[in-house]
């Protein structure tokens, strides 16, 4: 018995309505992220859903969430969320995770992703790492943003940090011994300093040599992570601006190492590993408000 056009459309509608949200839990040097494929689901990812998914006791748990959506001028569009349900413009680790999944799906070695930072080109390197063109850094005081006009190369704070934006704010302190810094004690105060109206990521970096730095992070909204792609980029960029680093830098975080390249003019390139941990579908209980 054949199904009429109206009944067929109704069946398709109901199929799409109840199509589950699939996800992949990814590990990017200890910076765990979740990639959700929302292209074939009628269940939108909202701030409340992102917060429930980010709960490490009752949800999936992540540092950042990347939601994959259809896009007309790129292979896909990405939206990012923090654990607390707040949106963010960029996440280097989650971008690598999404790029890895999409390149495996399409059996390709490069893709282009649309984000609030613009179009990001991602490639798989010969050793399996993911390279992401993260766009150019921004140095204007209003781009970071800061509360008032000033030189972002040396901020008027104890320790003379530098600031920049990679689509999110970064404040970098250069220290002699990164292990001597009590990040948990001073990180929250620096993150919420009045100079940063949207808060800031805070970096503490020890220059090992011109090609190698040791980095520890207090992440905006997130505390102390094992690693961060955008923070690695912001740190390397500020070190290059200060004349402390060459244009290709190995960034060593607690969870592993990435490479950052910046020629001082154009886009910043982030290169590093990412691995799938497990996959699944979002439970109905999480989808309900």
Per-segment meaning from a language model:
Residues 11-127, 172-289:
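A glycine-rich beta-to-alpha transition motif near the start of alpha/beta enzyme domains, typified by
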Residues 123, 133, 145, 156, ...:
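Generic structural detector for well-ordered beta-strands
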Residues 128-135:
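Short, solvent-exposed secondary-structure boundary/capping segments
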Residues 133, 161-165, 214:
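Active-site-proximal beta-strand elements of phosphoester/diester hydrolases
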Residues 136-137, 257:
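Short, charged beta-turn/beta-strand-edge "cap" motif at the junction between a beta-strand
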Residues 138-160:
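Active-site glycine-rich loop that binds ribose-phosphate moieties when present
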Residues 153-180:
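Internal active-site segments that recognize and position negatively charged phosphoryl groups
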């Amino acid at each position: 018995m054949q199904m009429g056009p109206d009944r067929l459309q109704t069946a398709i509608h109901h199929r799409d309505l109840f199509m589950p949200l699939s996800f992949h839990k990814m590990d990017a040097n200890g910076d765990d992220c979740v990639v959700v494929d929302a292209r074939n689901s009628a269940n939108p990812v909202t701030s409340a859903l992102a917060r429930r998914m980010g709960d490490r006791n009752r949800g999936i748990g992540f540092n950042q969430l990347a939601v994959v959506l259809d896009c007309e001028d790129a292979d896909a569009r990405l939206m990012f969320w923090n654990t607390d349900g707040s949106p963010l413009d960029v996440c280097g680790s989650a971008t690598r995770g999404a790029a890895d999944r999409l390149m495996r799906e399409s059996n390709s070695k490069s893709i282009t992703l649309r984000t609030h930072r613009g179009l990001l080109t991602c490639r798989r390197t010969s050793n399996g790492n993911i390279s992401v063109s993260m766009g150019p850094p921004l140095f204007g005081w209003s781009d970071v943003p800061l509360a008032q006009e000033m030189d972002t190369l040396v901020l008027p704070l104890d320790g003379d940090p530098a600031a920049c934006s990679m689509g999110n704010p970064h404040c970098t302190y250069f220290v002699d011994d990164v292990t001597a810094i009590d990040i948990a004690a001073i990180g929250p105060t620096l993150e919420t300093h009045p100079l940063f109206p949207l808060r800031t990521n805070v970096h503490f970096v020890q220059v090992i040599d011109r090609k190698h730095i040791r980095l520890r992070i207090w992440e905006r909204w997130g505390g102390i992570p094992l690693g961060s792609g955008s923070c690695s980029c912001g740190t390397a960029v500020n070190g290059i601006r200060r004349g402390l680093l060459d244009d290709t830098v190995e960034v060593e975080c607690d969870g592993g190492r990435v490479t950052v390249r910046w020629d001082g003019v154009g886009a910043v390139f982030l290169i590093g590993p990412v691995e799938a941990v497990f996959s699944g579908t979002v439970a109905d209980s999480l989808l309900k408000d």
